Amino acid sequence: MGMTRSKHLVLGFDQVIGKDKRFKFETYYQTLSNIPVTTRPSSFSLANTGSGFSRFFPDTLVNSGTGTNYGVEFTFEKSFTKGYFYMATLSLFDAKYKGSDGVERNSDFNTDYAFNALFAKEWKVSKRGILNLGGKITMAGARRYSPIDTFASRRQREYVELDAQKNTLRFGNAYSRIDARISYKINAKKVTHEIAFDLVNITNNRNILKYSYTSDAPYFREEYQLGFLPVFYYKLDF
């Protein structure tokens, strides 16, 4: 197999606001070529790998696939001054590809938009102790998926997509997740102690990851991404 090739065209704008804030804008256009696809006509493209955890066993591959990505990104950030910082980013984009069947489709990564916002605040509560509180919000458009091939799925006992209708449907809900973190750090002479408590997906939002096969009609069920997860840890830095 040969190497996948890409060409990029990028235009950006960066503006410093005051002493500690910055606004950035970037628009881009990218073309992809030589993407591995199957020799027989199908919707498969290696450009989609990495979007999930499904196994795939492709036929013989050839470097003839293509793809196109374009969009805009906005970033507003405040650097760490006066004991706190924050940053927000918004991406609006479109991602298409062509398999060996020559049909242009939405890629697995084409959620149309993504939004992230994070902040952290720090308080010095003693000579050596620092309390930190932070949070993060992540949002993205609904993931795309393909209708089930019921006959093939029942025969193979796993979710088999209708190849001709690859990524023509979308899950009902957009992706959203809120994380929070609180930590306490003690700066000793030779070592730094840190005790932290992370709250992952504190609203326990049920974000759909994929559909999987089930033996009962309608022969598929929803599989969800990580729900609420509290994580405690203690760290030593020497």
Language-model region placement:
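Membrane-embedded beta-strands that build the outer-membrane beta-barrel scaffold
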Residues: 9-17, 21-29, 72-78, 84-92, ...
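C-terminal beta-barrel architecture of Gram-negative outer-membrane proteins
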Residues: 110-185
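Membrane-embedded beta-barrel scaffold of Gram-negative outer-membrane proteins
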Residues: 2-57, 198
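Residues that define the transmembrane beta-barrel architecture of outer-membrane proteins
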Residues: 5-9, 66-70, 107-115, 174-178, ...
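Outer-membrane beta-barrel domain signature
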Residues: 1, 60-65, 104-106, 167-171, ...
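C-terminal beta-signal and adjacent terminal beta-strands/loops
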Residues: 33, 38, 86, 138-159, ...
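Extracytoplasmic loops and strand-loop junctions of Gram-negative outer membrane beta-barrel proteins
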Residues: 6-7, 53-61, 98-102, 160-168, ...
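Gram-negative outer-membrane beta-barrel transporters
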Residues: 29-31, 51-142
